[in-house]
Amino acid sequence: MSGKVLALVLLFRTFDQLLSHNRTRPNILMVMTDAFDGRLTFDPGSSVVKLPFITYLQELGVTFLNAYTNSPICCPSRAAMWSGQFVHLTQSWNNYKCLDANVTTWMDLLESNGYRTKRIGKLDYTSGSHSVSVCSNRVEAWTREVQFLLRQEGRPVAQLVGNMSTVRVMRKDWENTDEATRWLRQRAESPQQPFALYLGLNLPHPYKTESLGPTAGGSTFRTSPYWLEKVSSEHVSVPKWLPVAAMHPVDFYSTFTKNCSGSFTQEEITNVRAFYYAMCAEADAMLGQLISALRETRLLGNTVVVFTADHGELAMEHRQFYKMSMFEGSSHVPLLFTGPGLMSGVQVNQLVSLVDIYPTILDIADVSPVGPLSGYSLLSLLANYTSFSGRPHPDWVLSEYHGCNANSSTYMLRSGRWKYLAYADGLSVPPQLFADLSLDKEELHNVVFKFTDVYAHLDKLLRSIVDYPAVSAAVHLYNKKAFVAWSQTLGRNYSQVISNLRWHIDWQKDPSANERAIEKWL
């Protein structure tokens, strides 16, 4: 056999092997929502709002009951999911400072290993991609480290729009869902090559409050009567609040900067919560449109569907809305898988987090990871393998937060029945410890001084995972450098710009004192 003929034979054999391999690998669809409380995906939380397509995933797949974000804010959490690494390793400190644009994600690896890939909608994992708003992201540091308080967010409000026929409230998300649906139908025409599709939704993140100007954050919970009807009003609870004097100092700071330190009527609180649940129902319908497209194109049987979120939403729990907190409403995320070869109707108690998605998807696609990962593959929990060569998942998860609306870097270690919160250098801010979340589900009882042996054990474990005093110091240094770099770009306009940053009501009372506080910090 001539060399040319042999080369052709080997080429066609390799191509045939590739085609055969592709036919055995499943398609992958991930839907990642923004600010979806994971407790709504299982009882008793699931009773408050009808989520038929999440229920469908529950019945046909695997639901993780204890899934957590690795950082309760948009960009850092997504950086963890896309990179498979903890945010302190990638220095993804806030919504401005995240991953480099050329970082290798799990989807990049799928593409280089034969998958047809597509990303649609909200991505938010690279530096500068979320926002360049000077007060909310890039130089948010000064709002948390100088010794005066600022109001950064608008007061949370509920807004009803449209009527019973108004289905598409969040139009941009629906447009992205329509694009993803069209892309799926196109893939059905060439099923030989496996695909991986990612759809990022903005729902159920609250909308911008337009009256606060173009740089406003999201404090409006908007929905229509159509979606509000999906909410069981009798199950919408009014959360208990600690007295202000009993609040942890970091929690009080968050309450103040989120504009929640004033009084709220019971109606205001229940409206915010009910409208938020209705927004979750709208997001569920977008998931449903993609599931329906998979079913209609006969792709569903060979597609792994993943549903998750970057973080949760407090929805007035702990006298707060938004995220940026380690309380369950903010840190607990949904994580559901369904697809060929995976178990059906199973609930898993194992503690997991967003960094675990990276190695899990690569395992499902039979692709090897590149470089060290913080996450662990969950495939053995999804497919009930009797033999599994991967690393066993530890009995802990780590989450950390370094952004705005909190005046200290915060570290959460969930381990067994405990949730341990450490702050800053571990000395200057008192820790918190919550026991048995099934009994203290509202997380109102800090028992750190009651269980000192547990506190000592968990702090030692946390320090073995991350040198959190050193990380806090690195964030502190970054904050100063970021602020100086920003202020230098303003030149003579610095004083005017800084005095007019969004929602600031305190600056004009004593601008000189405020500027001296910043100079002292620097």
Give names to the regions the model predicted.
Residues 2-17:
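Cleavable N-terminal signal peptides of Sec/SRP-targeted secreted and luminal proteins
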Residues 23-26, 35-48, 148-170, 185-193, ...:
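Active-site-proximal cap/lid insertion segments
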Residues 41-77, 84-85, 111-118, 238-239:
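Short, structured active-site-proximal loop/turn typified by the sulfatase FGly-forming signature C/S-X-P-X-R
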Residues 80-179, 183-189, 210, 216-225:
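Catalytic-site neighborhoods of secreted/periplasmic enzymes
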